[in-house]
Every structure is written in C-alpha cells, then in structure tokens.
Amino acid sequence: MKAVELKRLLDSMARLTMGQKADVLEALQAGGDDEEVRSIAESRLIQTPACPHCKGGWIVRNGSASGLQRYKCRVCQRTFNTLTATPLARLRMKAKWLQQQDVLSQGLSVNKAAAALDVAPTTSFRWRHRFLQLAQAVKANDLNGVVEADETFFLRSSKGQRPGRKPRKRGGRASREERGMDLMPILVVRDRSGATADFLLEAVSKACLSQALKARIHSDAILCTDGSAAMAAAAHELHLHHEPLNLSAGERVRGPWHIQNVNAYHSRLKSWIARFHGVATSYLENYLGWFRALDRAAKNQQKSAPMLALALGLAGHH
C-alpha cells in the first residue's frame, strides 16, 4: 500500500464506530495469526527438507495455493505443501489454529471450544482429534534415576458405538461379574524429574508390562513399584534394580522409595479427564497425550502447550 493510501485509511479510522473498530482489530489479529501459523508450518521443511511421498531430499518451490508454498520433488515428480502427510492436511480456517491451540491448553469441552472458535461442534471435535493425533506418541524416553511405575484403571467406554452388551447408565461402574473386562489398565511411568510415559495395557501381566517398560527405562534406573507380582516379574526379566513397596503391610514410604509422584499424576489425570463426562476408549490415547502435553507445559512454565507444533510433528519427546 502506498503511503498516501495508508494515510487516507488511518484518517478514516477516526470515523469508525466502536463495533467497527472491534471488527478491524479482529481482522488484524486473524491476519497475524494466519501468518504465524504459516511460519510454524513452513519450519517443518526447514528442519527436514524431504518429500513426504518418497522421502527424497531434492525439492524445489512450485508456486503456492491456499496461502501455503507448494513444492515439487525432483525424484518422484509429485507436488506437496508443508502440511501434506500431517494430521492437519486439508483442514480449513488456518487463522484459527492458534486459537485452537489455546482452547486445548485450557482443556475446554467440545461445545465451549466451538463457541470460542465460532465453529460448529463437529468441526471442534474433528480439530481436537486431528491436533492430538501425533501428541499421543510423544512420551518420555530413557527414564532414569528413581522411576516410579503404577497402574490406574479407566472404565471402558463404547461411546458412539454399539457394543454387544447392555449399556451402562451414564457415570456407571464396572459390573462385578465383568470387572476385568470393563476396566482398562493404564500404566504410568514417571521419574523424579517429571518425565512421563503411559501405556494402555491389554492386561496387567508380566508380558504386557515388560513390553511397555523395555524401551523407556534406562538400564541403570531404579524402578519403584507397589510390589505386585507381575511388576516384580517384569523388572526381573528386564534386569532392572527393583525397589518394591509392601502396600498390603501399610508400607507407603521406605526411605527414598515411594510411588507418591506417579499416584499424584493419576489423581490429576482423572480429575482433568472427568470434565469430559466419559471418553470413548478408542480416543483415550489422544487424551492421555493431551494431558502429558499440558503437564510438560506446566513443568516448563509455558503459558500454553505447543499443541500446533505437536500436531505438525515438530515437538521433541520429553
């Protein structure tokens, strides 16, 4: 815009009503958010300049579309943009993605998020799970020092499905006859620095526990548990230094050994997830990843969790 045109525009601002000024500010904010989203998205190819189709590294600019730079791979001759092969591919309204990051950081319900974003509830739900698709895999690796491990349980939910059983009343409990089938075990592993990993288990067995723990805990770590037979067997199989507590005898703490950190994490997780009034088991891993992202942000004193970066695969494992 030329200087004369800009001056004319600024002079006209004085004649705007308060409502019109608010509309102008909203438009300016949306433009700034759209530019920031594009900048974050484009940083993917700066970090890893590779074709999403063939992984070739010989790529060139090839015009633009929908406000995003397009590229062409000289190896496979296919075109793409920086969102191709990410969970956010083909999602519209990029100017609202930073707001979506904020509503995820606040843990808003689908309807409250839809109202905040001025979108339909179906759009809010779809955006939530697109943003969380990669977050579920971001877990701590190589936990070390004193590592606490314990299971907690969530009621299985077939929300949105037609299970082959009589439906429970909302907020129901597992039946005594089918208690083992109705409860989903979640193993949470957390070291004293706050690094956390969690796993949905098929069963609380040596095989399932060993499979979950073997790639996450450093060989020199000290594993502290509630002393269950399955956990003791898994620790023995993985050759880990194991410090079990005898909870049945009332032993909660023995010197530096306890599982209070991981149990406190269980409590915060269940309290937070209760706001959603029942999470379908098919989506539970997304919510676990969401809560881990919020927990990391709180630990690092971040104003909001980097949910957009997580959705694009830009955030590292913590």
What are these regions (language model features)?
Residues M1-H318:
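Residue-level recognition of single "structural anchor" positions
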